[in-house]
Amino acid sequence: MNSIEFPLLDQIAQNSVISTTSNDLSNWSRLSSLWPLLYGTSCCFIEFASLIGSRFDFDRYGLVPRASPRQADLILTAGTVTMKMAPSLLRLYEQMPEPKYVIAMGACTITGGMFSTDSYSTVRGVDKLIPVDVYLPGCPPKPEAVIDAITKLRKKISREIYEDRIKSQPKNRCFTINHKFRVGRSIHTGNYDQALLYKYKSPSTSEIPPETFFKYKNAASSRELVN
């Protein structure tokens, strides 16, 4: 062992014995080797891209972005996920080797965001497709929040046991409520509902008799001349 990296090794730990388990050793080795697969579809990914620069320097956590899911053990979803993109995202997740983790970044990824109100093609939460380990809310989250999410994921990995990995597999997952669509009649028929129009119709000048309208108009004109 290199004594330069461990200067106190000869003085203190020369005859020491380190006892651990294979599970803890495996977790410790994976803490500094999280290789993320970047899945950015919207503006949240711009905030994550700033982490690559020298200001935040996310390389200190051992994060090495990979372009292939077969070389990654962390997928970071940032942005809106649509119905058409759902099969591709699920395929990328299935191609990642075990153990694998997911960070949902941004409101659009977690709940569908502002696009989930009237959109028929937006997935209302990426956890309906793949299991999520860390939720990172925000629109968009700051780079400091992304670092905090990675730190929390590292703490989760350090305490992980083999049974936890089994529970996260698709066959043992509890899915959330699926999308429920119903076909309704079209309201854009070009015809007005007369009953509804009469109910919410506000009074206008067209309902005032002509003689009354001109009477008040002449009175207002005379007062303006006096003033």
Swiss-Prot record:
Reactions mediated catalytically: a plastoquinone + NADH + (n+1) H(+)(in) = a plastoquinol + NAD(+) + n H(+)(out); a plastoquinone + NADPH + (n+1) H(+)(in) = a plastoquinol + NADP(+) + n H(+)(out)
Cofactor: [4Fe-4S] cluster
Cofactor binding note of this UniProt entry: Binds 1 [4Fe-4S] cluster.
Disulfide bonds: none
Entries under PROSITE patterns matching the protein: COMPLEX1_20K (PS01150)
Pfam families registered for this protein in UniProt: Oxidored_q6 (PF01058)
Compartments, record wording: Plastid, Chloroplast thylakoid membrane
EC number: 7.1.1.-
One GO location term (cellular component): respiratory chain complex I
UniProt keyword terms in alphabetical order: 4Fe-4S, Chloroplast, Iron, Iron-sulfur, Membrane, Metal-binding, NAD, NADP, Plastid, Plastoquinone, Quinone, Thylakoid, Translocase, Transport
Membrane topology category: Peripheral membrane protein
GO molecular function annotation: 4 iron, 4 sulfur cluster binding; iron ion binding; NADH dehydrogenase (ubiquinone) activity; quinone binding
Binding site for [4Fe-4S] cluster: 43-44, 108, 139
A biological process from GO: electron transport coupled proton transport
Record-stated family: Belongs to the complex I 20 kDa subunit family.
Function summary: NDH shuttles electrons from NAD(P)H:plastoquinone, via FMN and iron-sulfur (Fe-S) centers, to quinones in the photosynthetic chain and possibly in a chloroplast respiratory chain. The immediate electron acceptor for the enzyme in this species is believed to be plastoquinone. Couples the redox reaction to proton translocation, and thus conserves the redox energy in a proton gradient.
Oligomer status and interactors: NDH is composed of at least 16 different subunits, 5 of which are encoded in the nucleus.
Protein name: NAD(P)H-quinone oxidoreductase subunit K, chloroplastic
Species of provenance: Spinacia oleracea
